[in-house]
Curated annotation (Swiss-Prot):
This protein's name: CBL-interacting protein kinase 25
Residue numbers spanned by region PPI: 398-427
Keywords: ATP-binding, Kinase, Manganese, Nucleotide-binding, Serine/threonine-protein kinase, Transferase
InterPro entries for the chain: Kinase-like_dom_sf, NAF/FISL_domain, NAF_dom, Prot_kinase_dom, Protein_kinase_ATP_BS, Ser/Thr_kinase_AS
Renumbered residue ranges of the record's region Disordered: 303-340
A Pfam match: Pkinase
Function: CIPK serine-threonine protein kinases interact with CBL proteins. Binding of a CBL protein to the regulatory NAF domain of CIPK protein lead to the activation of the kinase in a calcium-dependent manner.
Chain's gene name: CIPK25
The UniProt record lists the keyword Phosphoprotein: no
Disulfide bonds: none
Stretches assigned to the Protein kinase domain: 21-281
Signal peptide interval: none
Species this chain originates from: Oryza sativa subsp. japonica
Length: 514
């Protein structure tokens, strides 16, 4: 079934060189890309590999669309959103390696009615999928992403029966909306378009997504379209006039929710937080509870038999794409191709001339132990601080913070665990990394923080703290009110002088020499 990448035409894999993946059959094809089933050679994991021809993208004017899709997928780490593993490119093609969702499209699971047509799903099944859809959309909005093309074709089901939102090619980012006051582009599938979208008066991306969720829910429950006219202009008129009927089988709670979802006035339409408070929605709803483990993989706390269910993800692409650390090669990188688990911007790929010209911000590999760093970059940054007071040593950059300590690693880890316990957070420790997670989930997901300890010298370590998930304001409050105060006694208030001929003297001397 699988073959090495490099031979064949048509439905066979394109001629590219890779040591990481084997290619299987063609499983999908669109205007801009072909999607192949693939398998990671080392792990055996099945993946979907989206292959795009760079010349065709330019010819069809699709370069910006693909850039946006990759940028959006970099932002998203949620169990109900299809995840991206890595991006590879050579002079001719771009390959996006993604999660393979074996179950296929959601509409395949509709029942058959007496006349042979689709009859939708049972109410409890539709509710479960709708709950997962709303959870995913709420998370996307919290990350500043509006999907803009929510429809049944873009809702997949995995082998465990969980919904996965896919295809962010038409999505918009919140900063686009802020620049333009409202989104202007009419995009998406007519049946799922909110009335304000096709009226071309500007629209709120979040409210348009809520409308599309309402259409999805109606179709899930009935197997029919709420606005059944096939002619686009008449369809738009039905949508604008809100001409749809809830079947008698709908309970009052369900009918109330559907009418609020399909409210043509966006200012009166229900919001995501309000959906989550509706009685029909809350029935049996279990919030997605997940955390990012010490290997940067997404895990659910709701797995079977008390074991965490694994949502595998090789790296936190959000963090790694802005990492200031030195690039480190990934083992098994394909010859003749670039690879980045953090998905490099396509503007860089477009400028690429040869296979050695693209510097990629790859994340550091996991450190099961605490080896001496080969680079003294972190030490140099601290040693060159203008003062050695506490505020200077708690160096903060966006969603990252780091400080230097002379305390034993075991004491630092114990203190981090203690601080987490004081605010009822959980703490998981593996080697020299502590993962701290909030026990309650908000609209933006549970706050998750990673604290890694690195050895600088025999006497000093650096602790790097970064937000992995959740609300940024909540992260900063935790750092300001809990973390800094709790760690105050462990942070060095002055770096020791260099020791000639031993200790950390070589490092300090190098720093002073600069």
């Amino acid at each position: 079934m699988f073959r090495s990448m490099g031979t064949g035409t048509g439905t066979k894999p394109p001629a590219m060189t890779t040591e990481r993946y084997e290619f299987g059959p063609l499983v999908g094809e669109g205007n801009f890309a072909k999607v192949y089933l693939g398998r990671h050679r080392a792990t055996g994991e099945e993946v979907a590999i989206k292959v795009m021809d760079k010349e065709k993208l330019v010819r069809l004017g699709a370069t910006e669309l693909i850039k946006r899709e990759i940028a959006v997928m970099q932002r998203l780490r949620h169990p109900n959103v299809v995840r991206i593993h890595e991006v590879m490119a050579n002079k001719r093609r771009i390959c996006v390696v993604m999660e393979y969702v074996r179950g296929g499209a959601l509409y395949r699971y509709f029942r058959r009615g007496p006349s042979g047509g689709a009859a939708g799903l049972r109410e409890h099944e539709a509710r479960r999928f709708f709950q997962q859809l709303v959870s995913a959309v709420a998370y996307c909005h919290s990350r500043g992403v509006f999907h803009r093309d929510i429809k049944l074709d873009n809702l997949l089901v995995d082998e465990q029966g969980n919904l996965k939102v896919a295809d962010f090619g038409l999505s918009a980012l919140a900063d686009m909306e802020r620049r333009e006051a409202h989104l202007q582009t009419v995009c998406g599938t007519p049946l799922f378009l909110a009335p304000e979208v096709f009226k071309r008066r500007g629209y709120d991306g979040a409210k348009a997504d809520v409308w599309a969720c309402g259409v999805v829910l109606y179709v899930l429950l009935t197997g029919r379209k709420p606005f059944p006219d096939e002619h686009v202009s008449r369809l738009y008129r039905l949508i604008g006039q809100n001409q749809f009927q809830c079947p008698p089988s709908f309970s009052p709670d369900l009918a109330r929710l559907v009418r609020r979802l399909l409210q043509p006035d966006p200012d009166r339409r229900i919001t995501i937080p309000e959906i989550m408070e509706m009685r029909w929605f809350k029935r049996g709803f279990k919030e997605v509870t997940y955390y990012i483990d010490s290997n940067d993989r997404l895990r659910s706390l709701d797995g079977l038999d008390g074991e965490p269910e694994l949502y595998d993800s090789d790296t936190d692409t959000i963090e790694s794409s802005s990492s200031s650390e030195s690039p480190t090669p990934v083992a098994g990188t394909p010859r003749g191709m670039h690879t980045s688990v953090s998905a490099p911007a396509l503007s860089e790929l477009d400028r690429m001339e040869d296979s050695a010209s693209l510097p990629l911000p790859l994340p550091l590999p996991p450190r099961p132990r605490m080896p001496r760093p080969k680079s003294l970059n972190a030490f140099d940054i601290i040693a060159s601080s203008p003062s050695f007071d506490l505020s200077g040593l708690f160096e903060e950059r966006g969603e990252r913070m780091r400080f230097v300590s002379g305390a034993p690693v075991a004491d630092i880890i114990a203190k981090l665990q203690e601080i987490a316990g004081m605010v009822s957070f959980t703490a998981r420790t593996k080697d020299c990394q502590v993962s701290i997670e909030a026990t309650r989930n908000g609209q933006k997901g549970a706050l998750a923080i990673s604290a890694k300890v690195f050895e600088l010298t025999r006497e000093l370590v650096m602790v790097q703290v970064c937000k992995k998930a959740g609300d940024t304001a909540e992260y900063r409050r935790f750092c300001d009110n809990e973390l800094k105060a709790g760690l105050r006694g462990l942070v060095v208030d002055a770096l020791p002088p260099p020791v000639e001929g031993g200790g950390h003297g070589g490092a300090a001397a190098a720093a002073e020499a600069e």
